Every structure is written in C-alpha cells, then in structure tokens.
C-alpha cells in the first residue's frame, strides 16, 4: 500500500499519520515502514539536544501498521474503523532517533466478533526496538 491507499483506510492525518508505506499485508501478517525525520513536531520537545521518538508514538505507529491486516478480515466493514482497545506486554528496548527507518511487523493472533489481537514489533536495521500485543475493536461505517 502506498500513501494514497493508506489514507483510504486510516483516518489519521498530519501530524499523527505514522505509517509511510505498507510493504506487505495479508489476512495474518503485515509489514510497514515509517521514515523517522527530525521535522516531526514531537522532536522539538522530546528532547532538546537529544531527540528521541516518544514510546507512545512508537506504539501508535505499531497500531496503525496493524490495520494493514485488520482491514483484510472478512468481518471488517468497508469504511469501518479499528480502535485501539488494549496494550499488553509493551517493551521498549532501545531508542528510535531521527533518520531511522522504523519497520513495523506483526501477526494477527485472533479475530472474533469484531475484536482483533495482534503481536507487533518495531525494528531498526533488523534490531527490535519495541514490541507489544495490541487489541482492537472494530466499528462499522455509519
């Protein structure tokens, strides 16, 4: 999925759109890319002189990437939304810096009755920087 296709399935927009490209996605697995740049507004205050991507934004990028698999589920309504409902076992192993290419990859663990659970990892140059299990609730289009 390129950015045009991503904009069709994610409601997020600047400065909160945190996925630049979905590299691979099927009903079970996904892999997406986020180019981390110093031009992003959070780097002005997190932290001056030592910019580090906030962990909560790494989690948000992971959640946005997971939608690549969720929208392919038979029960996902066209125009529907996936809301983050839970975060389990979040771990932040190393910082993410401006200039890094963040690879967000994961696997759908379960999907039933409009609720999905996904295991996600965030990597830079093959090294895991963060991981979590995320739960989503799907809401149909109105």
UniProtKB/Swiss-Prot annotation:
It catalyses: a (3R)-hydroxyacyl-[ACP] = a (2E)-enoyl-[ACP] + H2O. One of its GO terms (molecular function) is (3R)-hydroxyacyl-[acyl-carrier-protein] dehydratase activity. Keywords: Cytoplasm, Lipid A biosynthesis, Lipid biosynthesis, Lipid metabolism, Lyase. Transmembrane segments: none annotated. The keyword Isomerase does not apply. Pfam families: FabA (PF07977). GO terms for biological process: fatty acid biosynthetic process; lipid A biosynthetic process. GO terms for cellular component: cytoplasm; membrane. NCBIfam families: fabZ (TIGR01750), PRK00006.1 (NF000582). This is 3-hydroxyacyl-[acyl-carrier-protein] dehydratase FabZ. Belongs to the thioester dehydratase family. FabZ subfamily. Involved in unsaturated fatty acids biosynthesis. Catalyzes the dehydration of short chain beta-hydroxyacyl-ACPs and long chain saturated and unsaturated beta-hydroxyacyl-ACPs. The active site is at residue 46. Its EC number is 4.2.1.59.
């Amino acid at each position: 999925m390129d950015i045009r296709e991503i904009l069709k399935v994610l409601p997020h927009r600047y400065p909160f759109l945190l996925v630049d490209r979905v590299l691979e996605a099927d009903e079970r697995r996904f892999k997406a890319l986020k180019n981390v740049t110093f031009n992003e507004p959070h780097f002005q205050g997190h932290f001056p002189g030592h910019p580090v991507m906030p962990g909560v934004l790494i989690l948000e990028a992971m959640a946005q990437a997971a939608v690549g698999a969720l929208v392919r589920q038979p029960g996902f309504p066209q125009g529907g939304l996936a809301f983050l409902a839970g975060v389990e076992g979040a771990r932040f192993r190393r910082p993410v810096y401006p200039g890094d290419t963040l690879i967000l990859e994961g696997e759908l663990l379960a999907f039933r009755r409009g609720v999905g659970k996904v295991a996600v990892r965030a990597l830079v140059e093959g090294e895991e920087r963060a991981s979590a299990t995320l739960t989503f609730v799907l809401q149909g289009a109105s």
